[in-house]
């Protein structure tokens, strides 16, 4: 049996005393609860559930409790959703500065969120740089749009929760314990301190673990070394906790998964692998196919995308004989056109049938071609578009005839939840055309992260922050060169640098990044029995050095 990923001795007293434990993410909270269950299972038949919550979960609970209290200050108000938020920022920018691209909506939103989380106000910024002048205009319009629609931001809800604790509408906690936080915004600190007079940080028990440093030729060699090391470890003992940390895991997920899979097969190791980073829902096979089918109805698409749809198992064309598909592909290529419309595609594939008419299997395709209206002229609500999209997908045979595997079934369920979220945008009170509807649907599917449900696994692939607080028998942390660890500063271009440094805002002070890096490093050391740090000596034509924080650790060579 695998050991738990959490040292439960750190939490036993707090859980027995029914204290509130807060973590920065759901994963850490779930692992603490799981470890408590394993601990209790050996001696008890039943036990009480520990009060362990991720910070987001706890704040959501507090907000819902506040709404149940019918508090006058928030009566009739709701927290703006992520897609609503994007829409209001885009609208604020277009109304004030139509020549400015809507791509600035995200950075404007992130900047305003940081200002609020740091318990500051835009009015406090005195400098009048061109970027700041624009930003202040956008914020003014954004706040007006929220007020008009009785919406507030998440940090606004924090302020309301603080007031509830300060006015005794909420009872204070005797003690709040936090675990796994690397930094806490000032407004969140204020909220926790209002919720309890005693806020304590739980630290891992100090260990004498001495990390070793491995130098690799390049990033690919570094990943392969880590993967082979993990495979060898699991072959010698499959019942141990092994972790590989890849700082940019979310951006290199498929590559890392492929290299790890190759290493396990090379060493003849059959082992489950748990990956902390998810995939944008839009990039999963089933949902990408659905989006492609919806888009093809009213948008000319490149030949390559039509071929992807034609050979996909996720629509009615999967039942068309292969030779007919080959003939259709040749027919499309003979037109020498780069793009084809839905009608043009239907014409070619139906004409390839030996009788000269569409076979029964393609009748829905013909009906859709002949009967569907011009989407570009339709104006509907979001929920009406959701119904239309679902109808079109059903007509086009999505998600296919064959039985879905577990992964595909999870993707299908996530897609249905996404359409429900899309329908809830009706509260914007607008009707939109096909192009706008598809844009919002794509945004939602890109923002939604798909995490496959998998069984517990001995090998964990994690990002830097996801690994923090978890316990491992052996841990390998990659990407530890001097340019990457500590992280470099990144000044927000919309705010004056001096203002950011004065208030110690995110990513503006090298000493703050150094402090976070040291805290992470100490956590890895205290939560691992065996620890390796690696870095690439070259990246392209660039020569890299190990992080200065590793200078006192011995160097070793690891055999592949």
Q: What is each stretch, according to the model?
A:
Residues 1-560:
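Polyanion-engaging groove/track-forming segments
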């Amino acid at each position: 049996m695998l050991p738990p990923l959490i040292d439960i001795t750190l939490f036993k007293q707090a859980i027995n005393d029914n204290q509130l434990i807060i973590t920065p993410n759901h994963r850490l909270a779930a692992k603490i609860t799981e470890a408590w269950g394993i601990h209790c299972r050996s001696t008890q038949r039943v036990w009480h559930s520990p009060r362990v919550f991720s910070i987001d979960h706890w704040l959501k609970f507090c907000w819902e409790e506040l709404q149940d209290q019918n508090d006058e200050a928030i009566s009739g108000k709701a927290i703006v959703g992520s897609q609503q938020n994007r829409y209001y920022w885009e609208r604020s920018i277009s109304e004030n500065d139509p020549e400015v691209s809507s791509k600035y909506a995200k950075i404007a939103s992130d900047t305003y969120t940081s200002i609020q989380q740091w318990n500051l106000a835009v009015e406090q910024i005195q400098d009048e740089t061109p970027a700041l002048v624009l930003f202040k205009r956008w914020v003014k319009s954004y706040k007006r749009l929220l007020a008009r629609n009785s919406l507030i931001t998440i940090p606004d809800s924090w302020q309301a929760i603080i007031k509830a604790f300060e006015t005794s509408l909420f009872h204070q906690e005797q003690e709040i314990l936090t675990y796994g936080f690397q930094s806490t915004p000032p407004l969140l600190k204020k909220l926790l301190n209002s919720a309890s007079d005693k806020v304590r940080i739980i630290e891992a028990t100090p260990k004498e673990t001495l990390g070793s440093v491995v130098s690799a030729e390049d990033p690919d060699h570094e990943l392969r070394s880590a993967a082979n090391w993990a495979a060898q470890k699991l072959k010698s003992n499959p019942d141990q906790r092994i972790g590989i940390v890849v700082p940019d895991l979310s951006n290199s997920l498929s590559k890392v998964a492929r290299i790890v899979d190759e290493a396990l097969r090379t060493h003849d190791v059959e082992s489950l692998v748990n990956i902390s980073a998810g995939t944008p829902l839009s990039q999963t096979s089933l949902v990408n196919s659905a989006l492609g089918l919806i888009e093809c109805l009213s948008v000319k698409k490149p030949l390559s995308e039509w071929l992807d749809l034609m050979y996909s198992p996720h629509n009615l064309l999967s039942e068309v004989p292969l030779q007919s598909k080959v003939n259709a592909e040749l027919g499309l290529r003979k037109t020498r056109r780069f793009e084809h419309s839905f009608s043009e595609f239907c014409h070619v594939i139906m004409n390839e049938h030996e009788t000269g008419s569409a076979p029964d299997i393609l009748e829905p395709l013909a009906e859709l071609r002949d009967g569907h209206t011009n989407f570009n002229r339709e104006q509907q609500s979001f929920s009406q578009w959701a119904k239309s999209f679902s109808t079109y997908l059903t007509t086009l045979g999505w998600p296919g005839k064959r039985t879905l595997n577990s992964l595909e079934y999870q993707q299908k369920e996530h897609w249905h939840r996404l359409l429900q979220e899309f329908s809830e945008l009706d509260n914007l009170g607008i009707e939109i055309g096909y192009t706008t509807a598809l844009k919002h649907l794509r945004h939602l599917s890109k923002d939604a992260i798909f995490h496959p449900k998998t069984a517990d696994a001995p090998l964990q692939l994690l990002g830097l922050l996801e690994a923090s607080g978890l316990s491992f028998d052996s841990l390998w942390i990659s990407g530890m060169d001097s340019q990457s660890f500590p992280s470099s500063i990144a000044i927000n271009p919309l705010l004056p640098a001096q203002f950011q440094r004065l208030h110690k805002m995110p990513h503006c002070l090298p000493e703050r990044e150094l402090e976070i890096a040291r805290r992470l490093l100490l956590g890895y050391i205290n939560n691992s029995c065996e620890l390796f740090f690696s870095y690439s000596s070259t990246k392209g034509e660039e020569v890299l050095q190990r992080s200065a924080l590793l200078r006192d650790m011995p160097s070793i060579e690891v055999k592949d």
